[in-house]
């Protein structure tokens, strides 16, 4: 029987660009000492510029701290053009792992039509940037917006 060593990972939220990220950068240096398997970097849904937040922070973690990084990409408020630009920006800094998400719907803000489901985003990434590793997520009990389990599995 093989003994498996547990792995440790973290998920970080880029701060509001107006506030700055000095505290987060210090916390990341402390996390580095714990040798995490990876750190995932979230992205806000339509609130901040992904390049200034998610891409910049993922770049710092992967290239300055040498910790493998996964960038979140919530698609519901992104156009195909914006996703293609973001993939290019991530490629330029060497971050090639994406957590593809639909993203939360924000009351009062109309979602774009390019990516209704995370599966639409995944198909787009596989076509536009096939060298990226794409990770998905799901709700074990079924997505709350899905009309049925079958529909949930299909999307």
Regions found by a protein language model. Name each.
Residues 97-155:
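Conserved anion-binding
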Residues 7-25, 69-81, 133-154:
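Active-site mouth loops of central-metabolism enzymes
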Residues 73, 83-106:
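A generic, well-ordered mixed alpha/beta core segment in the N-terminal half of proteins
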Residues 3-7, 35-38, 65-69, 94-96, ...:
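Short, well-ordered coil/turn segments that N-cap beta-strands
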Residues 48-72, 115-137:
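Alpha-helix-loop-beta-strand connector modules within alpha/beta enzyme cores
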Residues 1-41, 51:
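Conserved N-terminal beta1-alpha1 strand-loop-helix module at the mouth
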Residues 35-57, 103-113:
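Glycine-rich, proline-tolerant flexible connector loops at the mouths of alpha/beta enzymes
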């Amino acid at each position: 029987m093989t003994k498996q060593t547990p792995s440790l990972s973290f998920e970080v939220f880029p701060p509001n660009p107006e506030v700055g990220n000095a505290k987060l950068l210090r916390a990341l240096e402390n996390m580095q000492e714990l040798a995490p398997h990876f750190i995932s970097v979230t992205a806000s849904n339509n609130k901040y510029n992904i390049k200034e937040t998610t891409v910049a922070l993922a770049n710092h973690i992967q290239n300055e701290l040498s910790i493998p990084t996964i960038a979140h990409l919530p698609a519901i408020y992104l156009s195909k053009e914006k996703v293609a630009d973001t993939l290019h920006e991530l490629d330029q800094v060497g971050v090639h792992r994406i957590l593809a998400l639909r993203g939360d719907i924000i009351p009062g803000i109309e979602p774009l039509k390019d990516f209704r489901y995370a599966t639409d985003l995944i198909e787009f990434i596989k076509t536009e940037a096939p060298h990226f590793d794409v990770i998905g997520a799901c709700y074990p009990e079924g997505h709350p917006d899905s009309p049925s389990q079958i529909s949930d599995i299909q999307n």
